């Protein structure tokens, strides 16, 4: 398994955290130098996601985060890799992580590497909906299909066809069609045309910041991007087509049925545990 950890070259504390975390499990990994607002970022956007440069409200740091994932995918495609595992440098790993990340026979037995798929390894401790996938459990963890929004890109496996799928579509989208990369991958902002996303349950990893928040603890690593993400998600909701008069009218007329659906979803939603 090729495990890539996106990290700023200057992030000594986070890189030490990753070396310790992966080292304790005996998991091989390599750092991928994250992009930051720079000429390199502008060149990458022009080549791969031209609409992102003119995005009306994503910050420079959010654009750099988006493009760090996109450039890593492009590198993997150029190297002819069938799939890669991608992490961010504030990730925590769960019990037995080496059984998933130091070998890949389990993956090849459950997923066709010539198809488009994502295995989401992370939980953000959000309430989510899933459905059965038919994929066999492995080491006490299940692979249900993710059926609702689930933020974060701190840990996932992505196949070659899935990388190509996203890069091809990102390249063609206008600025208003683009959103933070985690929402493009794991929400309904973007039509994935049925490409499956399996949510590992229990999750194998979590961001240190969100793990700390969920357990009412202080974060040791913090986040360079969290403030921007929260502001921009509020802006997305304001700019959403759902805020037009037509959509507000439709929402008013369908309020009762939507409330029923919300109640049903609340009964079925759950927080993916991390262990």
Curated annotation (Swiss-Prot):
Pathway in which this enzyme or protein is active: Glycan metabolism; lacto-N-neotetraose biosynthesis; Bacterial outer membrane biogenesis; lipooligosaccharide biosynthesis
Coiled coil (residue ranges): none
Single GO BP term: lipopolysaccharide biosynthetic process
UniProt-listed Enzyme Commission number(s): 2.-.-.-
Organism field: Neisseria meningitidis serogroup B (strain ATCC BAA-335 / MC58)
Similarity comment: Belongs to the glycosyltransferase 25 family.
Signal peptide annotation: none
Pfam families: Glyco_transf_25
Keywords, comma-separated and alphabetical: Glycosyltransferase, Lipopolysaccharide biosynthesis, Transferase
InterPro entries reported in the protein's UniProt record: Glyco_trans_25 (IPR002654)
GO terms assigned for molecular function: glycosyltransferase activity
Top-level taxon: Bacteria
Function per UniProt: Adds the second galactose to the lacto-N-tetraose chain in lipooligosaccharide (LOS).
Name of the molecule in the record: Lacto-N-neotetraose biosynthesis glycosyltransferase LgtB
């Amino acid at each position: 398994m090729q495990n890539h950890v996106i990290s700023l070259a200057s992030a000594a504390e986070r890189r030490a955290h990753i070396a310790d975390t992966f080292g304790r499990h005996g998991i091989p990994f390599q750092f991928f130098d994250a992009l930051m607002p720079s000429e390199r970022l502008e060149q990458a956007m022009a080549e791969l996601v031209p609409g992102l440069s003119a995005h009306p409200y994503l910050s420079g740091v959010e654009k750099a985060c988006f493009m760090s994932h996109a450039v890593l995918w492009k590198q993997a495609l150029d190297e002819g890799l069938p799939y890669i595992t991608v992490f961010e440098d504030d990730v925590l790993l769960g019990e037995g992580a080496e059984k998933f990340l130091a070998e890949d026979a389990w993956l090849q037995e459950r997923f066709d590497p010539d198809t488009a798929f994502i295995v989401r390894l992370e939980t953000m401790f959000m309430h989510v909906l899933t459905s059965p996938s038919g994929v066999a459990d492995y080491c006490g963890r299940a692979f249900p299909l993710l059926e609702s929004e689930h933020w974060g890109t701190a840990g996932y496996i992505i196949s070659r066809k899935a990388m190509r799928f996203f890069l091809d579509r990102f390249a063609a989208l206008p600025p208003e069609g683009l959103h933070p990369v985690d929402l493009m991958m794991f929400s309904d902002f973007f039509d994935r045309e049925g490409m499956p996303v399996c949510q590992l349950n229990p999750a194998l990893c979590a961001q240190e910041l969100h793990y700390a928040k969920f357990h009412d603890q202080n974060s040791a690593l913090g986040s360079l991007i969290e403030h921007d993400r929260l502001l921009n998600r509020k802006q997305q909701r304001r700019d959403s087509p759902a805020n037009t008069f037509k959509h507000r009218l439709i929402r008013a007329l369908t309020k009762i049925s939507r409330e029923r659906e919300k109640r049903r979803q609340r009964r079925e939603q759950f927080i993916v545990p991390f262990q």
